[in-house]
Regions:
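C-terminal non-catalytic regions of proteins with extracellular/luminal or membrane-system context
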Residues: 1-403
């Protein structure tokens, strides 16, 4: 699909311009970005990627109704189409979909259509899930080598997740679905088509072999998900938030939802800064975490300081068996002076190109010490209302997550 934009100035200097929009090119880029940005949290027994010819049963209504985005103005996008997971799996053709189970879902969806809500941005956070009892799960397992369970949530402006079923927590039907499928199948893959992180305690309860956050990947999100599931794309996304064991572990929970004011009791210790400083034991998946289908070896070749400029050179080698990309993250531990500091804070990160097995790339990571100055609002350092870089040792750590 191509569109042409033309323009002409009617007065003064007349100049005609012509620009062609290559929608196919943009769609391919969107698909690649959505696939690479998926975050693989768990992959026991090398369950992913799926192998050619594997028989797979797909559960969860969101396999048909893919969340391309959230609600509100950010979701009011006139996409020409939205790909979903089930049709993309069949289009791809690498695995064999359990079409009998697919038909059960399609018949159920006729009587349980998607709830769009009543008004702008009023779409509910989750959709009613089809009940999956033990008998259906066992029957599907007898016809398949693996199961995919797709769980969906929307998101949107003027709203946040709450500690309620269908929002941050799973619903009773989703719990039943996971319990029965994980019990019946030797290999279960859980795909999270969500706009925010959700409660993850079910991972320990039901022990699925693989867990993949695909977020909300736009109109090409379904195909992007399948690219990751089948290994066409190696996931290289990293968590941009900490996933705690329990929602009560987040310091913001205590003061969440006040319509009048937000009181940040955590002060400067927001997000991973709080957990790494005060509550490491409350973390289930750390900030910056994300697995790959291959393995990488990272080595710091050099580190230099010139004035306020800090430069590190990292050598990344793909020591695994498939191609992939890795992100090197540089963290700073600042001295604990008169102004409070988090134990670690992200300084800079860089991502490799796609490396084949055995290939190496050097990454240059640059940052400025001035960026880590703290604001002294009370004058405790003798420099009131100034940004102060306190004296002491500034220690940098390189890794692939905050740990």
């Amino acid at each position: 699909m191509m569109s042409t934009i033309t323009g002409c100035l009617q007065e003064g200097v007349i100049e005609r311009m012509k620009y062609t929009l290559d929608y196919q090119k943009y769609a391919e880029l969107a698909r690649r970005v959505a696939a690479e940005g998926s975050v693989l949290l768990r992959n026991e027994e090398d369950t992913l990627p799926l192998r050619r010819g594997q028989r797979v049963s797909v559960f969860g209504r969101t396999q048909f109704e893919h969340y391309k985005s959230g609600t509100g103005s950010g979701g009011m996008v006139n996409a020409p189409y939205v790909t979903n997971i089930i049709d993309s799996l069949k289009e791809d053709g690498i695995i064999q979909v359990n079409e009998a189970l697919e038909q059960v879902y399609r018949e159920w969806l006729k009587e349980h259509p998607f709830d769009v809500g009543e008004g702008w941005a009023m779409e509910p956070w989750n959709q009613e899930e089809m009940p999956v009892d033990e008998e259906l799960a066992v029957r599907a397992a007898g016809q398949s080598d693996a199961a995919i369970v797709v769980i969906g949530r929307t998101a949107g402006e003027d709203k946040d997740n709450s500690a309620a079923e269908g929002s941050y927590l799973l619903t009773a039907l989703e719990e039943e679905l996971l319990r029965n499928v994980c019990h019946a199948f030797e290999h279960t893959i859980v795909v999270l088509n969500v706009g925010n992180i959700i409660d993850m305690k079910w991972v320990d309860r039901y022990r699925p072999q693989a867990v993949l956050y695909i977020w909300q990947g736009g109109q090409e999100g379904g195909r992007a998900c399948v690219d990751v599931l089948t290994g066409k794309v190696n996931p290289s996304g990293k968590l941009s938030d900490t996933i705690a064991e329990d929602i009560e572990d987040y310091p913001s929970t205590e003061n969440f939802g006040d319509p009048v004011e937000n009181f940040y009791t955590e002060d400067i210790y927001v997000g991973y800064r709080y957990f790494e400083t005060f509550a490491k034991d409350k973390v289930k998946y750390p900030f910056g975490f994300g697995l790959s289908y291959t393995k990488f070896q990272t080595e710091i070749l050099g580190f230099s300081v010139q004035g306020m400029a800090v430069t590190a050179v990292a050598k990344v080698t793909n020591v695994g068996g498939v191609s992939g990309r890795e992100t090197v993250q540089l963290y700073l531990e600042a001295p604990q002076g008169k102004l409070g500091k988090p134990l670690r804070q992200l300084a800079v990160f860089a991502k490799t190109e796609e490396l084949k097995p055995g290939e190496t790339e050097e990454l240059l990571l640059k940052t400025e010490l001035a960026e880590y100055a703290s604001y002294d609002d009370s004058g405790v350092t003798g420099h009131k209302s100034c940004y102060v870089l306190e004296e002491g040792d500034y220690i940098f750590y390189a890794g692939t997550d905050v740990r």
